[in-house]
Swiss-Prot record:
Signal peptide: none
Keywords recorded for this protein, A-Z: Cytoplasm, Dioxygenase, Flavonoid biosynthesis, Iron, Metal-binding, Oxidoreductase, Vitamin C
Protein name: Flavonol synthase/flavanone 3-hydroxylase
Native source organism of the sequence: Solanum tuberosum (Potato)
InterPro entries listed in its UniProt record: DIOX_N (IPR026992), IPNS-like_FE2OG_OXY (IPR044861), IPNS-like_sf (IPR027443), Oxoglu/Fe-dep_dioxygenase_dom (IPR005123), Plant_2OG-oxidoreductases (IPR050295)
EC number: 1.14.11.9, 1.14.20.6
Similarity annotation: Belongs to the iron/ascorbate-dependent oxidoreductase family.
Binding site residues for Fe cation: 238, 240, 291
Iron found in the keyword field: yes
């Protein structure tokens, strides 16, 4: 009689899209991986990572906003211009809220039978990103990332489709709703600082982004052990399409000054990525961060990014108060759904 794990691996390999978790379980004793996961030489981590150097991404304490907001804004502005990524500490989200989020996500991927996971799979050709899946972007030359994922919206309530929320483990919904509640407070503060840093009123960037209509899209990335982490990537190099992305620490690599670097992260800090839409709103003053995710030979890695996105019909362009004769618009104003279509299909914006 097959074990549940064996059954799950067999099921995952017979699906229309083979799941990386299943491929990992079969290749774990090998010294090779399927060719579609082997990156070109100019992408392979072993060949392109600057070895022996670990970057210290800016760490910003956001607990003292009431005491010295000017200092906080300056730190966030500098990090957003120079790095496009920073870590916030003393953010107010209780450790147990983050731990519960991680616990239920891990249980979904590792304890729920494969057949049950497939019930909430993203349908081929679906317009929405939501659901359990494997491939996302149209990869160059058919190459794939060494990752399975689960997408679903966690805010606002009107945007949530619980069809894509796992029913098991039973505490999944509660853990995610609690995390969303706390995360919104952090996001509001970051939007305010980014707005003030551009010489705008504190509310202007949030309003330009859509205020209460901003969509919080959670993605759980599951990177199983990979026999050849020197050849594969979990997620290919990219910038996020979002306004900002908030995530619990994850071993992403950052491209800075012409090199790929490993980065030092603080446990239970919240990592902030500046995304494409804030770069557009700021007319290029803030920079979206170019990053990628590597994998590990011996252990599973997971991450929980939350992408703060416009609604699909929302139009995003440079904030009008930032535009004048000396600062003409550097980006087109367009509906977010059109931006996403172009980016996922590697078309010019």
């Amino acid at each position: 009689m097959k074990t549940i794990q064996g059954q799950s691996a067999t099921t995952a390999l017979t699906m229309e899209v083979a799941r990386v978790q299943a491929i990992s379980s079969i290749t774990k004793c090998m010294d090779t991986i399927p060719s579609e996961y082997i990156r070109s030489e100019n992408e392979q981590p072993a060949a392109t990572t600057l070895q022996g150097v670990v970057l210290e991404v800016p760490v910003i304490d956001i607990s003292n906003v009431d005491d010295d907001e000017e200092k906080l804004v300056k730190e966030i502005v500098e990090a957003s211009k120079e790095w496009g990524i920073f870590q916030v500490i003393n953010h107010g989200i209780p450790d147990e809220v983050i731990e519960n989020l991680q616990k239920v996500g891990k249980e979904f991927f590792e304890e729920v039978p494969q057949e049950e996971k497939e019930l909430i799979a993203k349908k081929p050709g679906a317009q929405s990103l939501e659901g359990y899946g494997t491939s996302l972007q149209k990869e160059i030359e058919g190459k794939k990332g060494w990752v399975d994922h689960l997408f679903h919206k966690i805010w606002p309530p009107s945007a949530i489709n619980y069809r894509y929320w796992p029913k098991n483990p039973p505490s999944y919904r509660e853990a995610n709703e609690e995390y969303a509640k706390w995360l919104r407070k952090v996001a509001d503060g970051i939007f305010r600082s980014l707005s003030l840093g551009l010489g705008l009123e504190g509310h202007e960037m949030m309003e330009a982004a859509g205020s209460e209509d901003i969509v919080y899209m959670l993605k759980i990335n599951y990177y199983p052990p990979c026999p050849r982490p020197d050849l594969a990537l979990g997620v290919v190099a990219h910038t996020d399409m979002s306004y900002i992305t908030l995530l619990v620490p994850n071993e992403v690599q950052v491209f800075k000054d012409g090199h790929w670097y490993d980065v030092n992260y603080i446990p239970n800090a919240i990592i902030v990525h500046i995304g494409d839409q804030v770069e557009i709103l700021s007319n290029g003053k803030y920079k979206s961060v170019y990053h990628r995710t590597t994998v590990n030979k011996y252990k599973t890695r997971m991450s929980w990014p939350v992408f703060l996105e416009p609604s699909s019909e929302h139009e995003v362009g440079p904030i009008p108060n930032l535009i004048n004769e000396a600062n003409p618009p550097k980006f087109k104003t367009k509906k977010y759904k059109d931006y996403v279509y172009c980016k996922l299909n590697k078309l010019p914006q």
